[in-house]
Structures are given as structure tokens and as C-alpha cells.
């Protein structure tokens, strides 16, 4: 899902997509940051693994590059731990750029949870449920719990990206899935 969005959405809005071959730290440890700087990247999508790998080279490595073209950052692919999240927010987002953490995937119909520019940022968290999913936290009996209480995460509605049927064969879809 993310790959398809990355490939299609920039051109739909008149933008460009930067795809780099190879590893982000070869032939030198500044390669990734130099690509962002030289191409004046405005929208950056990362996975926590990438940031953990790059932050090991130290703060000075990234501080030597001009990343002022960045306007928004997005992450996905895995959960964040606090140290890389804080490092990324401080050194790349400069404690002010929107940093949208997204959970979803092709197999779940798209975006289930996302950060927003309207909600405060907290390490590893999401601002809200994806459009229409009806996210809720419930107890063992399936009843909603009060804010701040521990419970189980449920999605009460199907994701808007879920397949509804097979082409001209609703019955086969219902029988199969």
C-alpha cells in the first residue's frame, strides 16, 4: 500500500519521487542526508530501522546538512522505540515538523492509525484512528474502557480499503473469505 502510494501520489500532485539505489550509508555515512539536501526533499518517509542505523553515526553527521526543505515526515513499517523517535524528532524534524506515524498495510486495507498535525506528538504514538475504522479500547467483555485504562484494541468497522467483493461474483467472495 505504501509503495503504491509513494509511486503514484507525487505525480498526481505534480511532484517527484526520489528513489535511491543501494544502502543509505555507502559510499559514506552522509549519503542519505546529502540526497535529501541536494534534491531539496520536502516529504520524507522513513522506517525506524533506517533511523536507528543512521543515528549511530552521531548527531554531527546529520547536523552538517541543510534539511530545511523538509515540510513533513512520515514513518511506518514497524513500531518506534523512544530513543530513535526522539533523535529523529530533534535532529530531523527540529522539534517542529509534523511527524506522522502510520500503521496499516496492504493486507489490512490501508491506514488503520495515523498521526495528524492536529494532535500532540508523543514518542511511538498515533494521533487517531484511520478514516472510518472505529478504533476503540475495550475490556475482556468487549465493553469500552475509560481513557487511560489498559484494554484491547479493536476496530469496530471495516477499513475503507477492504475488498468488498470479487468482480461480478459476490457469492464466490462470501464463500471464500
Locate predicted features.
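Conserved AMP-binding/adenylation subdomain of ANL enzymes
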Residues: 2-42, 57
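Short acidic, glycine/serine/threonine-rich loops at helix termini
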Residues: 4-8, 30, 84-86, 111-115, ...
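Gly/Ser/Thr-rich phosphate-binding loop
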Residues: 12-15, 33, 41-46, 55-123, ...
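Nucleotide phosphate-binding site architecture
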Residues: 25, 51-52, 163, 174
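Alpha-helix/helix-capping structural signal
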Residues: 49-52, 78, 160-161
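Conserved ATP/PPi-binding loop(s) of AMP-dependent carboxylate-activating enzymes
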Residues: 129-132, 143-176
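Hydrophobic alpha-helical segments, especially N-terminal targeting/anchoring helices
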Residues: 138-139
Amino acid at each position: 500500500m505504501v509503495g503504491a502510494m509513494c509511486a503514484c501520489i507525487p505525480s498526481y500532485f505534480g511532484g517527484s519521487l526520489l528513489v535511491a539505489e543501494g544502502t543509505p550509508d555507502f559510499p559514506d555515512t552522509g549519503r542519505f542526508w546529502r540526497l535529501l539536501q541536494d534534491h531539496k526533499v520536502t516529504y520524507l518517509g522513513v522506517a525506524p530501522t533506517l533511523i536507528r542505523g543512521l543515528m549511530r553515526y552521531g548527531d554531527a553527521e546529520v547536523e552538517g546538512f541543510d534539511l530545511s526543505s523538509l515540510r513533513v515526515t512520515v514513518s511506518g513499517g514497524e513500531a518506534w522505540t523512544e530513543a530513535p523517535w526522539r533523535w529523529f524528532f530533534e535532529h530531523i524534524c527540529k522539534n517542529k515538523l509534523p511527524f506522522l506515524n502510520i500503521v496499516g498495510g496492504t493486507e489490512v486495507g490501508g491506514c488503520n492509525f495515523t498521526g495528524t498535525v492536529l494532535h500532540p506528538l508523543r514518542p511511538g504514538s498515533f494521533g487517531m484512528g484511520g478514516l472510518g475504522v472505529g478504533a476503540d479500547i475495550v475490556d475482556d467483555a468487549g465493553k469500552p474502557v475509560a481513557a487511560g485504562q489498559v484494554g484491547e484494541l479493536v476496530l469496530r468497522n471495516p477499513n475503507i480499503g477492504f475488498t468488498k467483493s470479487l468482480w461480478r461474483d459476490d457469492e464466490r467472495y462470501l464463500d471464500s473469505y
